[in-house]
Amino acid sequence: MRTKSCFAAVRMFAICTLLSSPALSPAFAAPADVPVRLAGAQTSPAQVYGKLFSSQQEEVVAAAEAMPADKYNFAPTNGTFQGVRTFAQQVTHIASSQYYFFTGFGLKPSVDSDAIDKLTSKDEIVKALKDSYAFAHQAVETITPENAFEQFGEHKNTRAGIAAMGLAHTNDHYGQMVVYLRMNGIIPPASRK
């Protein structure tokens, strides 16, 4: 069901485009004493992001599980392109990045995200990936209509913006994982539907 993935990608692009819109910048923001209301919103931001992360998680975890353990050190033309991540490094980068993005929501991870980058076995890496998605889900569940666009932290980010960036970042690396799978003769699980 390639169409489902295509629509998901288009939906993700639209959300990221909307969230990066100048109309959402502080210069266009409502005064602090005016509550933020999403016109006609029937679904909370937490539900929207939760569904997006669940959909992404399904594809990314399936791709991580599809690569055989003996291919986790594969990198395309490793000798020619110095510094290209291996498949394992793509997956650990996604996992550790989830913690990086969402620790700013005030949640404390139960793992050292730097240690994730040192994992070597497929089983450990896939577990770390799944755990990082649990952490991401926990974070996006805290996004409300009232706090979605509030700026916080040193970099004046918003929860909605961080969640969108987390999704976009992982989609980039998922795309690379798909190429690695195909270079090894493996059809990505999302393309098999």
Question: Where do the language-model regions lie?
Answer:
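Bacterial N-terminal signal peptides
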Residues: 11-25
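N-terminal secretory signal peptides that target proteins for export/translocation
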Residues: 1-9
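Solvent-exposed, charged/polar functional surfaces in cytosolic regulatory/catalytic domains
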Residues: 59-62, 66, 135-139, 176
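Short, helix-capping/interhelical loops that line the mouth of catalytic, cofactor-
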Residues: 29-48, 92-155, 184-193
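Short, contiguous alpha-helical
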Residues: 50, 54, 58-61, 73-114, ...
